């Protein structure tokens, strides 16, 4: 995590890096090559989670958590096959139902999301241009889809912190009208959130929605 970094600098970095990495993203986002994002522990990260033990012990414990979340077991290949099959069952169910609207609701969240015609739910594994299956995100628990750009209405409250450009955004609330964020607040990192939302007009809209289980190897770590 970066400390005391001007949110304007973070926003500018994200914008410039997006332009500089455009060709690379063209390959990965269209699956012209197989790729994966993985988590690698650092000493600072480990001590942030486990401040009361030595740096080495903290690193070891963080590696253990990452291995658990990433299903690095005695037979990780089989574990990932079973996990991908389980996620695919969920996406097959949703794709067969073709729900027109989703409703997210909690004590604060009250959000209605319209789904576009012909929408397709996806999950953990993908296939490259040669038809070879791979997992771009490890670990992953989500099934996800594209919402209707102008069909998101209501209030959305975060349940976990968001780390953006090394800065933490916590306890934030977004209000949507006709797909667009029209108001927002955050108890921590509100200025960073502002720059994220105001990157351009497109960043005022949701590009993806996801469903994740309440209990999972990631969630159960409670870190």
Residue locations for each model-derived region?
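Long, well-ordered mid-to-C-terminal structural blocks that present hydrophobic/aromatic surfaces
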Residues: 145-195
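Active-site bordering "gate/hinge" segments
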Residues: 1-153
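Dual-mode signal for accessory low-complexity, basic/Gly-rich regions
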Residues: 183-223
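Short solvent-exposed loop/turn micro-motifs enriched in small/polar/acidic residues
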Residues: 95-97, 165-167, 202
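Short, glycine-/Ser/Thr-/acidic-enriched flexible segments
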Residues: 1, 42, 109, 118-120, ...
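A short secondary-structure junction signal
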Residues: 3-5, 46-51, 124-126, 167-170, ...
